Amino acid sequence: LILAPGLDPHDYEPRPKDVAGLADASLIFAVGLGLDPWAQGLARSAGAGEARVFELGPLMDPILAPPGLIRPEPLIDPHFWTDPVRAQRTVDVLVEALSGLDPEGGPFYRERGGALKRSIQSLDAEVSRQSETWARRRVVTLHGSLFYFAARYGLQVTAVVQPAPGAEPTAQHMAAVVTELRGPPGAALFTEPQMESQVATALAREAGVPLHEVDALGGGPKAASYEELVRGIARAMDGALR
């Protein structure tokens, strides 16, 4: 694991021990789609070679967010794992890649991959039932991280606060987001634990709406597993949209 739990991949800067830890790696899995552009350089620094970096995102039917209120230019959301259907596809890709690298371990990877997919299928059915109360509700996020979850479970992401991760929105964009939050019916505003939320806090105050938190990255004590991550997102939606 290169990126420690709780860190924002957009701001990550490789440390010497991260480089050293990859020196003997046979395969490096990355998200791609602009989330971890440092992965290729990190592999080169470690002597692992670019060919050993396997980007998963481009294989997951990336979602292109629309222009307009969302941000001035289209953006691609790299957080494909928030959709359990794509997560199951990711398991298949991982099993195939690992089996190709280690053919003798193939039966083990396929067995474990099958068990994980069954768990994710059950999770998807659980959240699908839970999401019936959210149908067509509107959400505003700090940055573009919930388009896949929203598409899977019938939500509408109608605005993104930051035009790009870490970028300050313009006054015009802030005003448009405030208008969106005020409705009618008003959209729910979400920040994220890995990112600074001062702008989102100011927006919530200006619009007179609550500020909710959702974790699309996971890794912390409340989202240590994939299932906990998705259930955590679902709980956040329940708390904001019921």
Segments predicted by a language model, with ranges:
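Extracytoplasmic metal-acquisition and chelation regions
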Residues: L1-R242
